[in-house]
Amino acid sequence: MSTSIFVNVPVRDLAAAMAYYKALGFEHNPQFTDETAASIVISDTIYVMLLTHEKFQDFSKKPIPDFNNEIGALYALSRDSREAVDAIAAAALKAGGTEQRDPDDYGFMYSRAIADLDGHVWEYVYMDMAQFPSE
């Protein structure tokens, strides 16, 4: 069995968050979706669990910060090309995401950072290992 990752993030509006991730081209798994949570399928081994604040508090009693003003983590997802990075960034912005900085372009690596509707920052990254510096 492959190792999977489930990234659990608190959201203020579950329906809006689901629509946002659907606009990026991701599907949801109805088997793990109800009125308090939604499973977003990123790949065969990567899932984002969108949890209402109340549901999230079942897992942690720590206060949920305002991710628009604080940050707890950056989540990075690889893409197959620079164009694919720009395409998902454009979809995220159109769906209401917020660009966090200018694109990073190191020649061998290109990335964009977009905050979702709840302020969770996702970096979309393309790496061309053939262009990776040898030293």
Q: Which ranges hold each PLM region?
A:
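N-terminal beta-strand motif that seeds the catalytic metal site of vicinal oxygen chelate
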Residues: 1-18, 74-77, 128-135
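A short, acidic/glycine-rich surface segment
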Residues: 56-63, 132-134
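Short, flexible turn/loop "capping" segments at secondary-structure junctions
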Residues: 1, 65-70
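Residues at or immediately preceding the N-termini of alpha-helices
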Residues: 14, 82-83
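Vicinal oxygen chelate
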Residues: 89-135
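A generic secondary-structure micro-motif detector
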Residues: 6-7, 26, 78, 105
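Short amphipathic alpha-helices within nucleic acid-binding modules
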Residues: 83-89
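Core segments of cupin and vicinal oxygen chelate
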Residues: 8-57
